[in-house]
Amino acid sequence: ALWVFLVHSATTNNPFINPHLFRDRNFTIGLALVFIYGMLNITPTVMIPTMLQNLMGYPDSMIGILLAARGAGMVLGFFIVAQIAKVDPRIGMISGVAAIGLSGWYMALFNLQVDPWAVALAGILQGVGSAVMWVPLSIVAFATLPVKLYPEASSIFHLLRNFGSSIFISVSVLTVSRTGKISYSELAENVSAFTDIARYPQLMGLW
């Protein structure tokens, strides 16, 4: 399908996507950045609730409150970016990437004893970073494009954001599932009917 799409775009007078879009350097760089943005922005909202519910036993109401902290962070971020955009959009992009990276590093340190306030703080930080990055990224990507190309450019721009999210969510879920099975297999190797732990039914039940 990709080959047919490329051949069609290169040979027809009326291609599905106007190739002139990709001659704009700002837009091309913006596509790469929005792809990365999609990867980093949505994945935690899929993975964190699973961890909180299945591994830590949080009720649904608490998980909803902790996820709402990210939305509060985005609201705060939009107020911040309104001031940054008056100076230089690139400052907002750099600041947003830094905030998202910091929140990702913070979430990488999570364990089963993590405090709910730590989860909320990571969500707020990611929300602020997402908002601060999104607005200037959109401004810079479309800054030098002709107005007549905006409809096509917008569709591609948001398609790549969703594409990045879909790919990274799939990879993340696959990685968690695979590593979980590997860890379980490594633990199960040391347990059999002949090991000492088998003499304690309560421990076997926990296993």
Segments and roles (model prediction):
Residues 1-11:
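C-terminal membrane-cytosol helix-exit motif in multi-pass small-molecule transporters
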Residues 3, 37, 81-82, 186-190, ...:
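Short, charged low-complexity intrinsically disordered segments located at boundaries
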Residues 177-207:
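A membrane-interface helix-boundary motif in multi-pass transporters
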Residues 13-182:
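12-transmembrane solute porter fold
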